[in-house]
């Protein structure tokens, strides 16, 4: 029993000892693991350079937003091997200092990406630097999407879709039936370039920009008031403003003092303007009551709310900002995309320059600004909120999205014409209407300032005279008559302003550019202005009121051999051959029984030829006795009748058109050296080959055609018609080519008169009043031989069917005639052959008895 207890005690001691050893080892391993866990983790640093104006509110907001965004990102993704660190530099708002700061970051800090570009020039400089150093440059500021930036492969931009915004503003105008507006924008490259999409969509939707005004940051109140008084006097009530907050804080108080923030007016602000506004100037906000603005749409989410609260707490007390700007929200999303891209780019096997390629894939996430779209190196925001400024705040009245719906709770402008109620300036809810003050003056005509080229050398087309005593300019001519007839229904008083430089094609380009660049001085241009593609970039043209294209003129042909021109030589020879063949066949049939076809050899040849050619005038005197000869003559007379009728018709055409000749490569062609024809003949393949000579006046044309120096004249159709009308007996229009677009009236881009005048021109053409005006000034209808009227001689191929029928008929007559003759001749030949064979056979059997005697005589001799 005692031994058993001793054994059990030893057993338990052994187990206890082993358990103790195991526990000690376990504790030792745990301590080692804890020591390992407490070792510092090494992250790979990815340096990003930030170049902003630290003194600007926007620069401060973006810097704070990026810092907080990276902190939040790595708090959520603490397992990432990389950490993005931001190294900031102050650009002080100077593009050159921004470039120097970026170069310093690249050289001293070896940053792998740059964030910055608060202006267009600054963005271009950084983009050029990034292109040379192969470092991505990202801009979260609202720099316009310029074509000059699109060429940089390493430049990435966060921006709103200006094209979608322009469509939205144009749709807003259509919704309220507005067709004219005043465009106010900031006099700066950034703002000037970013307004171009809106101008283009206004033109496409026939919305006329009545006036444009540029205000710079240095513009004082006196300058602004002067422009606003001009707009108020014009009667235009709809304004579109594309300006920064600094200019807006001066513009709207001035507008209110002039009574332009009262009922009947409408002000629309673009997205770039609204996105940059901060809630710092409450008095300026109150001055903007009733304004409508487009803003980049930022969805109200819990994440945005929480981030905004923490962001406000991070600001210093002196920085009073109630909400984040759009740029700072975009900067937050860009920071998250950069952090994701840095992790992907630093994976084993990838180079440091793969950061650019990793950004598009890393941008596919939902940020504070909503679903991020990365299209063509741009973070695109294409959703816009339409807000109405009320008091010190703003109220959403609708959404604009060129794609799909954003929310079912709000109305979308693209799906319905009804927005929520808008409080317009003056507290009115009635939609402002376009009513020009000039239209309110009962019976008084509106003035239309029209440029006319004073140096025209063709008074029938346009002539400008100025009375130096009164200073009044009068214009007459075909172009003026058409214009005044077209503009008559619209109650305009036309003031003609002479343009002294219009003496050649290039100066006409200058005339068009003057109309484009001096919109406050001129409304339209009238004259012999050819519609061209490059001119259409600057002005809007009406429908052409003249024939389109160039015309070719030549002298009328007065050759004495013109009677032979209707038929080709081969056809003349073929007809002559058939005349002789007809006489020969008739002679062959009639010569045995008809005494008229008998006689000596020369008499028979003369009869054969006279009979054949006399069928041309149906005057043959010989009486025919055989039916086959009569058949031959009837068929040939039928053919002659067809040939003579076609010859007569063709000769008539020849005498009318006067043998119009085609252009040959060895003939000289003249053109007016100062007209558009000088450009066209050198560029168009239709006129390649001939030698061209530039002439200066109509007298030069006349003399050159008369003495043969040139064979043809090429010029625009109206000039050619006028030239031929002066010399109808000498010259004729040969051909026309539609290589120019004719003359048109030029108006300012977007002018509503373009469509109205075009409709009147079409009405004049349909009622033939346009033709009557042309005939009045050109004296008579010009004879024109177009390509359809140009003479083409008749050929053998034209009458191949007729000659085939005639030939078959002649062959048939010969065969019928020769069958009985062959029978008689065959009998005679057989008879003679039989006699010859019989005689020959008899001589071989019975020799003649006289043969031996003759042989003996020969031997004796």
From Swiss-Prot:
One of its GO terms (cellular component) is plasma membrane. Expressed predominantly in roots and siliques. The chain crosses the membrane at residues 569-589, 599-619, 631-651, 801-821. It is found in: Membrane. It is a multi-pass membrane protein. Residues 30-568, 652-800 are extracellular. Its main location: membrane. One of its GO terms (molecular function) is monoatomic cation channel activity. SMART domains: PBPe. Residues 590-598, 620-630, 822-861 are cytoplasmic. Glycans are attached at residues 306, 534, 707. Keywords: Glycoprotein, Ion channel, Ion transport, Ligand-gated ion channel, Membrane, Receptor, Signal, Transmembrane, Transmembrane helix, Transport. InterPro entries: ANF_lig-bd_rcpt (IPR001828), GABAb_receptor_plant_PBP1 (IPR044440), Ionotropic_Glu_rcpt (IPR015683), Iontro_rcpt_C (IPR001320), Iontropic_Glu_rcpt_pln (IPR017103), Peripla_BP_I (IPR028082), Solute-binding_3/MltF_N (IPR001638). Gene3D superfamilies: 1.10.287.70, 3.40.50.2300, Periplasmic binding protein-like II (3.40.190.10). One of its GO terms (biological process) is intracellular monoatomic cation homeostasis. Residues 1-29 form the signal peptide. May form heteromers. Glutamate-gated receptor that probably acts as a non-selective cation channel. Can transport calcium ions. May be involved in light-signal transduction and calcium homeostasis via the regulation of calcium influx into cells. Belongs to the glutamate-gated ion channel (TC 1.A.10.1) family. This is Glutamate receptor 1.4. The lineage of its organism: Eukaryota, Viridiplantae, Streptophyta, Embryophyta, Tracheophyta.
């Amino acid at each position: 029993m005692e031994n058993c207890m001793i054994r059990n005690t030893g057993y338990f001691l052994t187990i206890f000892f082993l358990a103790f050893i195991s526990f000690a080892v376990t504790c030792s391993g745990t301590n080692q693991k804890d020591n390992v866990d407490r070792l510092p983790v090494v992250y790979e640093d990815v340096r990003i350079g930030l170049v902003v104006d630290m003194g600007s509110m926007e620069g401060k907001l973006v810097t704070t937003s990026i810092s907080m965004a990276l902190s939040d990102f790595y708090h959520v993704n603490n397992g990432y091997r990389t950490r993005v660190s931001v190294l900031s530099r102050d650009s002080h708002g100077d593009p050159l200092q921004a470039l120097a700061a970026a170069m310093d970051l690249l050289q001293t800090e070896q940053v792998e990406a740059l964030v910055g570009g608060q202006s267009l020039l600054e963005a271009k400089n950084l983009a050029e630097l990034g292109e040379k150093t192969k470092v991505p440059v990202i801009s979260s500021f609202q720099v316009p999407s310029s074509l000059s930036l699109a060429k940089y492969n390493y430049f990435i931009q966060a921006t709103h879709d200006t094209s979608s915004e322009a469509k939205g503003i144009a749709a807003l105008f259509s919704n309220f039936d507005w067709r004219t507006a005043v465009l106010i924008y900031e006099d700066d490259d950034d703002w000037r370039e970013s307004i171009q999409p809106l101008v283009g969509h206004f033109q496409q939707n026939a919305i006329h920009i009545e006036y444009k005004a540029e205000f710079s940051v240095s513009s004082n109140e006196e300058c602004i008031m002067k422009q606003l008084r001009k707009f108020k006097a014009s009667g235009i009530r709809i304004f579109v403003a594309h300006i920064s907050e600094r200019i807006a804080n001066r513009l709207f108080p001035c507008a209110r003092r002039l009574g332009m923030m009262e009922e009947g007016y409408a002000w629309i602000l673009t997205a770039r303007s609204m996105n940059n506004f901060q809630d710092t100037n409450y008095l300026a906000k109150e001055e903007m009551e009733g304004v409508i603005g487009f803003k980049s749409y930022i969805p109200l989410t819990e994440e945005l709310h929480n981030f905004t609260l923490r962001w406000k707490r991070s600001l210093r007390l002196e920085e009073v900002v109630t909400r984040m700007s759009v740029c700072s929200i975009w900067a937050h999303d860009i920071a998250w995309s950069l952090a994701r891209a840095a992790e992907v780019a630093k994976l084993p096997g990838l180079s440091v320059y793969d950061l650019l390629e990793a950004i598009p894939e890393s941008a596919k996430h939902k940020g504070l600004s909503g679903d991020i779209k990365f299209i063509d190196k741009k973070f695109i925001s294409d959703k816009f909120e339409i807000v109405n400024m009320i008091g010190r705040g703003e109220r959403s009245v609708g959404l604009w999205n060129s794609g799909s719906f954003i929310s079912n709770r709000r109305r979308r402008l693209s799906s319905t014409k009804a927005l929520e109620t808008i409080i317009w300036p003056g507290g009115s809810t009635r939609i402002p209407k376009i009513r020009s003050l000039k239209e309110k003056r009962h019976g008084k005509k509106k003035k239309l300032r029209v440029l006319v080229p004073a140096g025209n050398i063709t008074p029938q087309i346009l002539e400008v005279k100025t009375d130096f005593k009164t200073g009044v300019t009068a214009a007459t001519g075909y172009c003026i008559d058409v214009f005044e007839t077209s503009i008559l229904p619209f109650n305009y008083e036309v003031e003609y302003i002479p343009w002294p430089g219009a003496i050649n094609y290039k100066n006409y380009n200058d005339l068009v550019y003057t109309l484009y660049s001096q919109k406050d001085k001129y409304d339209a241009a009238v004259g012999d202005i050819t519609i061209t593609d490059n001119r259409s970039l600057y002005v809007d043209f009406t429908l052409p009121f003249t024939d389109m294209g160039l015309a070719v003129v030549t002298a009328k042909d007065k050759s004495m051999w013109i009677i032979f021109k209707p038929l080709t030589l081969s056809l003349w020879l073929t007809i002559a051959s058939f005349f002789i063949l007809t006489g020969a066949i008739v002679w062959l049939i009639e010569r045995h029984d008809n005494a008229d076809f008998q006689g000596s050899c020369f008499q028979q040849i003369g009869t054969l030829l006279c009979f054949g050619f006399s069928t041309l005038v149906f005057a043959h005197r010989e009486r025919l006795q055989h039916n086959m000869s009569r058949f031959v003559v009837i068929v040939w007379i039928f053919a002659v009748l067809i040939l003579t009728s076609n010859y007569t018709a063709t000769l008539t055409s020849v005498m009318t058109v006067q043998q119009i000749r085609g252009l040959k490569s060895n003939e000289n062609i003249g053109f007016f050296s100062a007209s558009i024809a000088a450009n066209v003949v050198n560029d168009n393949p239709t006129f390649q080959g001939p030698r061209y000579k530039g002439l200066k006046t109509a007298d030069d044309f006349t003399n050159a055609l008369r003495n043969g120096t040139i064979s043809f004249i090429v010029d625009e159709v109206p000039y050619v018609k006028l030239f031929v009308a002066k010399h109808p007996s000498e010259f004729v229009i040969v051909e026309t080519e539609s290589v120019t677009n004719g003359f048109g009236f030029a108006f300012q881009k977007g002018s509503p008169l373009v469509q109205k005048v075009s409709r009147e021109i079409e009405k004049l053409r349909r009622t033939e009043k346009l033709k009557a005006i042309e005939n009045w000034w050109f004296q008579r209808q010009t004879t024109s031989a177009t390509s359809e009227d140009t003479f083409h001689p008749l050929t053998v191929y034209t009458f191949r069917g007729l000659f085939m029928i005639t030939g078959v008929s002649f062959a048939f007559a010969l065969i019928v005639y020769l069958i009985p003759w062959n029978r008689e001749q065959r009998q005679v030949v057989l008879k003679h052959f039989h006699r010859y064979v019989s005689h020959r056979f008899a001589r071989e059997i019975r020799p003649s008895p006289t043969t031996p005697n003759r042989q003996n005589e020969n031997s004796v001799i």
